[in-house]
Regions:
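Active-site mouth of glycoside hydrolases
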Residues: 1-123
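Structured helix-beta-strand junction loops
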Residues: 17, 55-56, 90, 109, ...
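Hydrophobic anchor at the start of a short beta-strand
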Residues: 21, 134, 305
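Short, solvent-exposed loop/turn segments at secondary-structure junctions
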Residues: 28, 68, 101-102, 141-142, ...
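Short, flexible/disordered intra-domain loops and linkers
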Residues: 35, 71-75, 145-154, 187-189
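Catalytic-core region of carbohydrate-active enzymes that cleave or remodel glycosidic bonds
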Residues: 91, 107-183, 195
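Aromatic- and carboxylate-lined catalytic core of secreted/periplasmic carbohydrate-active enzymes
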Residues: 144, 157-319, 329-336
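Short, solvent-exposed loop/turn segments in extracellular or other extracytoplasmic domains
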Residues: 321-325
Length: 336
């Protein structure tokens, strides 16, 4: 039981640090035999694990890391998910992490989406598709490896967090810098070397100060994607009903008739705008060095406009008592 005793110590230590644990139950890169026991022994292992660890309040269940690479059938995954949910008396969060094929978070026993992807532009779609919390738990790592997945800057990592929260989703951080001792933080922890953690903490502080959960707003072109998938008669009726401008009607019609090319164009122009009802609006301009933005705010509310520099970690009030149409002046810098 030395393995389990060591695991207990780590779980307790992380809990004392205020850290939630997404515990991976099966692993395709396993070197200790857990991935080749067979289904019956898989369930025996899970039975013991759940009896031993379920009482910890800060633990989640990740059925697998990159589940498609393990030696299990779809039916076996169904059984594993059902077994974990049935034998966990405390109802911990439960999901499964993909490499290519995203686990279907619409499954009744799955509590949230656990997604590996570098395509930030689809986060809003996933939030709307699943109507559950979406955790982008592998968006690449801040570091300097030769691999695509381990070689983004701290600035890019910070941007990905803001893109996630402005899509209504969540994001996780990891770090993969080469070091003299040849130990990656991603694998063994230690001292963080990157520039994104303090910026992520700044992001978290702002998001936690808001009056509720942010919901992403699809851009205009993005909102046309469902329209393009309708039948022609229904689509034309919607266009005639909702759009007065002849030019805009032409643009929408051409978009809807342009197939996958138009959809790709729409995703390439994803706008990271979010709101909490009419209480709060958050616009992240990403790499766009905009000089201004025209905001359309409710006429019956009064708003304070604050300019956030996500990289320099500053927040400045630039206007108060604003409603209706307002032209916000921006500093023509990225990361605002």
């Amino acid at each position: 039981y030395a393995f389990w005793d060591a695991l207990d110590r780590h779980v307790v230590r992380l809990g004392r640090m205020g850290i939630q644990i997404d515990l991976i139950l099966f692993h395709p890169y396993d070197r200790w035999g857990f991935d080749g026991m067979g289904h019956e022994k898989d369930l025996q292992y899970l039975d013991y694990l759940l009896r031993r660890l379920s009482a910890y309040p800060h633990i989640w269940w990740s059925l697998a890391n990159e589940y498609e690479l393990t030696k299990r059938t779809g039916q076996e995954w169904d059984a594993i998910e059902a077994f974990v949910a049935e034998h966990d008396p405390y109802g911990h969060l439960l999901s499964c992490h993909n490499i290519f094929k995203i686990w279907d978070a619409n499954r009744p026993l799955t509590t949230h989406a656990s997604i590996q992807s570098k395509d930030m532009n689809r986060l809003g779609d996933w939030c709307r598709r699943y109507n559950k919390p979406v955790m982008l738990d592998e968006c690449a790592y801040e570091g300097n490896l030769e691999h695509f997945w381990g070689c983004i800057t701290g600035e890019e990592m910070s941007r990905r967090f803001w893109k996630a929260v402005c899509s209504g989703a969540y994001c996780t951080h990891g770090e993969t810098f080469y070091s003299d001792d040849d130990i990656l933080w991603w694998a063994r922890g230690g001292v963080l070397k990157g520039t994104s953690p303090e910026r992520i903490a700044f992001c978290r502080k702002i998001i936690e100060s808001l009056p509720g959960h942010l919901e992403g707003e699809p851009s205009f072109l993005h909102s046309l994607i469902p329209l393009a998938k309708m039948g022609e008669a229904e689509r034309n009726a919607r266009i005639a009903e909702r759009i007065d401008s002849e030019l805009l009607r032409t643009v929408v019609t051409v978009f809807c008739n342009s197939g996958p090319d138009a959809e790709s164009f729409a995703y390439s122009e994803t706008a990271y705008y979010a709101h909490i009802g009419t209480d709060c609006y958050l616009h992240f301009y990403d790499t766009r060095p905009a000089a201004r933005d025209t905001l359309q705010l409710p006429e019956d509310r009064k708003y304070t406009i604050q300019l956030i520099d996500t990289w320099n970690m500053t927040m400045e009030t630039v206007a108060e008592g604003v409603s209706g149409t307002y032209v916000a002046r921006l500093p023509s810098r990225e990361n605002m």
